[in-house]
Regions:
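Alpha-helical structural context detector biased toward long hydrophobic helices
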Residues: 1-8, 14-338
Length: 338
């Protein structure tokens, strides 16, 4: 095994989580899924061991393991965004170019978490069977034409390299083509590469504003910190908004006192939201409700059971633990068994 591989993939950057750390090393963590009721509601965890999934981004090429996604995130998104975050936290204005860097980071963060993996995988499972069926049928029709003497159809070649685990079997005698694919880590990484290259442009023109919490509110963050919000009123909203969908609100906590906000297709300054006790309380509620498995804070927060009650389930907890532990081997085997 290559000793230079990262393996421990942080899906939330450590520099970001440190904004909720009182000592620069640890953070208060609320677990939504626990093994038994005796587990404390809040525990102090090392940032180094928070928001980590071993080999979440590791991919396979032949017999070689490659972790260039982790380095790509750091090089293309985290490192450029760090000084922009520092300016926002210090109350400084940012340039248009820095706003684009910020947009790239927030968009990347939206799609790089376990919660995003589940969203995209669910979407892939729904779409891919039909896509593969249509593609196979088209290839088979063209193969039959070739067998009858018609000229070969020139299929358009894809420009981008695909990480999608796929096997194509050709039966020359029957002029049939069979396509098999695995929907899992490989398809997710393929999604990420596409989203963070060609689709990334959709995020570049948002008018980001930094909103302040009211004095009595402290914003937490979570393991799924970017919220795409369809908001109708305080009792009627959902988290299924889109980056290019007009009037969708996009939020991301920056610190216990600050939250990043934009509305697609609109311009700020959103003065009625800034320092507002009403909206600060509402944003805090949304952050907690949107969490996948963990809420992070600088100190234990009250009212968690009302907003996102933890699930006490030993079997489910153990199953998820085992799935994460066996994730890498299972994904490798699935791809090699194609």
């Amino acid at each position: 095994m290559d000793q230079n591989l990262t393996h421990r993939n942080h899906y939330i950057p450590r520099f970001y989580l440190k904004n909720w750390s009182l000592d620069g090393k640890t953070i208060q963590t609320y677990s939504i899924l626990v093994s038994n009721s005796k587990v404390p509601y809040w525990t102090q965890q090392s940032i180094k061991n928070s928001a980590v999934w071993n080999d979440f981004y590791t991919r396979i090429e032949g017999d070689k393991e490659i972790d260039n996604f982790e380095h790509w995130f750091d090089r293309e998104f985290e490192t450029p965004a760090k000084p922009v975050f520092d300016k926002l936290l210090n109350g400084q204005k940012i340039s248009y170019e820095e706003s684009v860097v910020l947009s790239h980071f927030v968009f990347a963060q939206y799609v790089r978490t376990p919660a995003a993996y589940l969203r995209l995988t669910e979407q892939n499972i729904k779409l891919f069977p039909k896509i593969l069926e249509e593609t196979t049928a088209k290839i088979n029709r063209e193969a039959e034409k070739i067998r009858k003497g018609y000229p070969a159809f020139q299929f358009q070649k894809t420009v981008r390299e695909s990480f999608f685990p796929m096997k194509v079997t050709v039966d020359k005698e029957q002029s049939l083509v069979e396509i098999k694919a695995v929907v899992g880590r490989g398809s997710y990484l393929d999604n990420l590469k596409h989203l963070l290259s060609s689709t990334l442009k959709v995020a570049e023109h948002h008018d980001w504003r930094v909103l302040h919490a009211s004095e009595d509110i402290s914003f937490p963050t979570s393991d799924d910190p970017v919220i795409c919000l369809n908001y109708r009123n305080a009792d009627d909203y959902d988290f299924k908004g889109g980056w290019g969908r007009k009037n969708c609100n996009i939020l991301m906590p920056l610190s216990p006192r600050l939250i990043l906000f934009t509305q697609v297709g609109a311009k700020g300054p959103y003065k009625d939201l800034d320092h507002s006790p009403y909206y600060s309380k509402l944003f805090r509620r949304m952050i907690i409700q949107h969490a996948h498995r963990y809420v992070y804070s600088d100190r234990p927060q009250k009212g968690m059971l009302e907003l996102n009650a933890r699930v006490v389930n030993a079997q489910l907890y153990e199953r998820e633990k085992q799935e994460m532990a066996g994730w890498h081997i299972e994904q490798i085997q699935a791809e090699r068994n194609l």
